[in-house]
Amino acid sequence: MSGYLESVLVLLAINTILAYAAFLPMVAGQLNLGVAAFVAIGAYSAGYLSNSFGLHPVAAALAAVAVAAMLGWIVAFPILRTRGIYLALATFALNQLVQGTILNLDAVGGASGYPVPAHIGFPVVAAFAAAVIVLVFLAFRTRFGISVTAVSDDERAADLMGLSVRGLQSAAFTAGAALAGLAGALYAHHFNYVEAQNYGVLFSIYVVLYVLLGGTQTAYGPLLGAAVFTLLPELLRGSAAWRYVIFACLIIAIMSLRPQGVIVRGSWFSKRAA
C-alpha cells in the first residue's frame, strides 16, 4: 500500500470515529462545538503518557480515552444545564479554554507542537474504527440507544415517560468525549506529531458537518458524512485550486436538497439495518 493511500485510509478511519463522537451528543439533542477540545486532550494525553512513561501506544490510546471520558463527564453536568445557542457557546468556550491551556503548556511543547515518536499503524487504526462502528450500531439496538433516540425525538415526552433525560444526555456527551479522545490519540500516534493550533472551533464545525451531511436519524449518517468529507476532496485533487470551490458547492447542494441529511429513517439503509 502506498504511503498516500494509507494516509487517506487512516484519515477516513479517524474521521469516522470523530463523526460518531459528534453524533452521540447530537442524537441526544446536544450540539457540541467542543469536539476538538477532547480530540486535543486525547492526542496530548496519549503522547505524554507514551513519551514520559514509556506506555505502549495502544495502551496510551486507551488511557487517553479514559482521560477524555472522565473530563467529558465532569464538564457535562454544568454545560448541559444550558440549551440551544447557549449550549453551543458553552462548548465553544470549552474548546477555546482547552486549546489556550495547551498552547501555554511547555511540558507538551506549547505553541511549537509535540512530537510523538511511538507509532500506530493503519491496521490498528482500522481495527479501532471498526470496533467503534460495531459498538455504536449495537448500542442503538439497546435500551440506552432507544432511550437516547426518544430524547432526541421529544425531550418532554421522554421525561414524562420516566426517562432520565439529563442522565442520558450526560452519558451521550461523555461517550462522545471518549470517542473524540480516541481519535486524537490515534492521530497523534500515527502521524507522530500534534499541534494545538489544529484543534480550534473550526475543527469542531467540520466534524459536526460530517454528521449533518450524513444525517442524525440513523447510525449510517455519520459513516457516510465522514466518507464524503474525507474522500471527495481527494477525488477532486486533480482540479487543483478549484477543488475546494467544487467541493463546497457540492456540499451546499446536498444539504439544500437534503436538509435532514442524506440518510433518514425509512431510507434503504435504515430498512436494511432493521
Annotate each predicted stretch with a short phrase:
Residues 1-274:
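Transmembrane alpha-helices and adjacent helix-loop boundaries
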